[in-house]
Amino acid sequence: GGTGDQNPVHLMEIFHIDPTIQDYNRKWLALYEGVNRCNQAIRILKGSDYDKKETRIAEMRFLRAHFYFNLKIIYNQIPYFDESVSDPSAFASISNKEYTSDQLWEKILNDFKAAYEGLPDSQPDVARPCKMTARAYMAKVYLFQGKWQECATATDEVINSGKYQLLPD
């Protein structure tokens, strides 16, 4: 047992945030770099005539929601911006108090819902998200919101899809 030599990782896992530990700053930066890349990709894709445009936008919305989900559970009150913010100088003026906690969860959930609607049932590449991946993340958001029935409905859909199973004991 124990935390070994990775105490900052252990502290992050138990939500003991200490701003003097550089791992938290690196995590924050990496997640927001991911958000920004997704936003840039969405802006570019929206202006393209790429034949897989809608699927790729759904993938980017899934990834953006994934990054924001992690930001929300680690840091709680976070700045939120989407693809409509394209000027990097605007980032400094985005407040982490612009949205309530419930509003942030809804924004994250809306991206997962859009991903669920836009993603195919399966993907040719293993690492790409599919419809049930988005639905499973929706269940996680409902769980963090305390919306038990919605969580149960979402998880039942994933389980009953027949595509996934628990590993044997």
Residue spans of the language-model regions?
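Short, surface-exposed recognition loops and adjoining beta-strand edges that mediate ligand/DNA contacts
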Residues: 1, 81-84, 120-137, 144-169
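Short, surface-exposed, charge-dense and proline/glycine-enriched linear segments
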Residues: 7-20, 80-86, 111, 148-160
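Conserved, well-structured interaction surfaces
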Residues: 2-75, 95-106, 112-126
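Mature extracytoplasmic enzyme cores
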Residues: 110-111, 134
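Extended, well-ordered alpha-helical segments in internal regulatory regions
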Residues: 67-76, 138-147
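Short coil/linker segments at helix-helix boundaries
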Residues: 77-101
